[in-house]
């Protein structure tokens, strides 16, 4: 397939006010998507958003474009990305659209689409939408224009769905949990789910103002959560990102529990329950410690390219039901169709309750190898990965690791960054080697 002009690995994303995240482009995008999606029968689209101030502007633009193409929009208001996927399925809508830039700062935003079955749009549908964007906008006849409505009980519907993934025979009674909602889309969802299941809940990151999403909080910055868990003598902490599709946890000691460890816990529990179908999928970034721990359990493991859509594709290719990224995207197809931070967290909590074990104990069967990730910003027109000095630097680092570690360089799918990852047995060595490669990348940028 030819290279796409606008769609990246997770929809369309950028800085608000700069192409392509402008009101006029998003209106045209709504129209183009409407033209393509209307061919498939249904005429309703679910639109959700996170808590960014630009969400108001962009949802209005999307709705106008969809209406011009003859499709109606149903707004959920601030709602986690996986909630939009769920509501798209239950309403039998033709598609769901999420206005979010996930873990990015408030001044970024993006648009991503879900199919009628709650999975991300196939590449060929995204390509068809891009093809329509090159055509002049034409409006349907007045009698065929789309309408707008609001799903007033969207939050309640999703809360009940999340609770339904937690066994009826279990309770969270007696657990003290700190929930960090990143001032994002889970702020009015996650605390209610946990409280209704019996937990004592302390919240941070639940006062969104349109500009504080992901700011020093949430899954990408758990320092405040770690401190609060220890200060409150809580049993654990749960950190979601801005749109609620990621989860990072913190144990009672304040130690971080990442997506690799969460995947290990839920996979081992599924194995114990006789509900693990085949193996599990990680990514090129997944820690070697995960692979070794799963091997000890006899659980097959495969690595996909980085990106939750590629994890899901590999799961589907192999017929497996579980996968994750170490960043906290955890996909459990027996429960939902996409990464869902709340649902993933509930499966960990169920394992704790069922086995009468702490989060620390559940992690004890897996030892993470030291892994250092350095992000290097680069100018869009250059490609540091093709630079001879960078390639020589990587080769030298691999020689020093002598087969007892890994080196991975890749471009981010959502930002102009080169991600440098080095993994090995000694943290200081790994840190030094990662910085050596990062310096070479900077020089080439």
Curated annotation (Swiss-Prot):
Q: What is the lineage of its organism?
A: Bacteria, Pseudomonadati, Pseudomonadota, Gammaproteobacteria, Enterobacterales
Name the InterPro entries on file. A-D-PHexomutase_a/b/a-I, A-D-PHexomutase_a/b/a-I/II/III, A-D-PHexomutase_a/b/a-II, A-D-PHexomutase_a/b/a-III, A-D-PHexomutase_C, A-D-PHexomutase_C_sf, A-D-PHexomutase_CS, Alpha-D-phosphohexomutase_SF
Gene name on record? glmM
Q: Which family does it belong to?
A: Belongs to the phosphohexose mutase family.
Catalyzes what? Answer: alpha-D-glucosamine 1-phosphate = D-glucosamine 6-phosphate
GO molecular function, a single term: magnesium ion binding
| One family name in Pfam for this protein | PGM_PMM_III
Question: Bound how, and how many: what does the cofactor note say?
Answer: Binds 1 Mg(2+) ion per subunit.
PTM comment, free text: Activated by phosphorylation.
Q: Which GO terms describe its biological process?
A: carbohydrate metabolic process; peptidoglycan biosynthetic process; UDP-N-acetylglucosamine biosynthetic process
Q: Which Gene3D superfamilies match?
A: Alpha-D-Glucose-1,6-Bisphosphate, subunit A, domain 3 (3.40.120.10), Alpha-D-phosphohexomutase, C-terminal domain (3.30.310.50)
- HAMAP family (alphabetical): GlmM_B
Q: Which residues bind Mg(2+)?
A: 102, 241, 243, 245
Protein's name according to its UniProt entry = Phosphoglucosamine mutase
Q: Which organism is it from?
A: Edwardsiella ictaluri (strain 93-146)
């Amino acid at each position: 397939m030819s290279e796409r002009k606008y769609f990246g690995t997770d929809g369309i994303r950028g800085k608000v006010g700069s192409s392509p995240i402008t009101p006029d482009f998003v209106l045209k995008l709504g129209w183009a998507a409407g033209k393509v999606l209307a061919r498939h029968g249904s005429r309703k689209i679910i639109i959700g958003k996170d808590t960014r101030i630009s969400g108001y502007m962009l949802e209005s633009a999307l709705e106008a474009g969809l209406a011009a193409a003859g499709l109606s929009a149903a707004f959920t208001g601030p709602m986690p990305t996986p909630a939009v996927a769920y509501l798209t399925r239950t309403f039998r809508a033709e598609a769901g659209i999420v206005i979010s830039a996930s873990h990015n700062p408030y001044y970024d935003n993006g648009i991503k689409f879900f199919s009628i079955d709650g999975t991300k749009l196939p590449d060929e549908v995204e390509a068809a939408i891009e093809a329509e964007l090159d055509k002049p906008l034409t409006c349907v006849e007045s009698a065929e224009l789309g309408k707008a409505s609001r799903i007033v009980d969207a939050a309640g519907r999703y809360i009940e769905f999340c609770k339904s993934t937690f066994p009826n025979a279990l309770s969270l009674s007696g657990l003290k949990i700190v929930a960090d909602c990143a001032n994002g889309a889970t702020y009015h969802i996650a605390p209610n789910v946990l409280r209704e299941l019996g937990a004592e809940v302390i919240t941070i990151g639940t006062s969104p103002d349109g500009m504080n999403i992901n700011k020093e909080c949430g899954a990408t910055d758990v320092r405040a959560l770690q401190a609060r868990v220890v200060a409150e003598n809580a049993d654990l902490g749960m950190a979601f990102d801005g749109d609620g599709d990621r989860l990072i946890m913190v144990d009672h000691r304040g130690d971080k529990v990442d997506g690799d460890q969460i995947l290990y816990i839920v996979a081992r529990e599924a194995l114990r329950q006789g509900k693990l179908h085949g193996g599990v999928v990680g990514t090129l970034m997944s820690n070697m410690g995960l692979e070794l721990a799963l091997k000890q359990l006899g659980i097959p493991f495969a690595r996909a390219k980085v990106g939750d859509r590629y994890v899901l594709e590999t799961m589907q290719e192999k017929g497996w039901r579980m996968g994750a990224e170490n960043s906290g995207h955890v996909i459990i197809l027996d429960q939902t169709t996409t990464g869902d931070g709340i649902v993933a967290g509930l499966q960990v909590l169920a394992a704790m309750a069922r086995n009468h074990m702490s989060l620390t104990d559940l992690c004890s069967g897996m030892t993470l190898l030291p892994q250092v990730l350095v992000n290097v910003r680069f100018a869009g027109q250059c490609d540091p990965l093709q630079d001879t000095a960078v390639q020589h630097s990587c080769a030298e680092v691999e020689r020093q690791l002598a087969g007892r570690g890994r080196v991975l360089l890749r471009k981010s799918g959502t930002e102009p960054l080169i991600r440098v990852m080095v993994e090995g047995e000694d943290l200081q060595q790994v840190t030094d080697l990662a910085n050596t490669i990062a310096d070479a990348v900077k020089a080439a940028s």
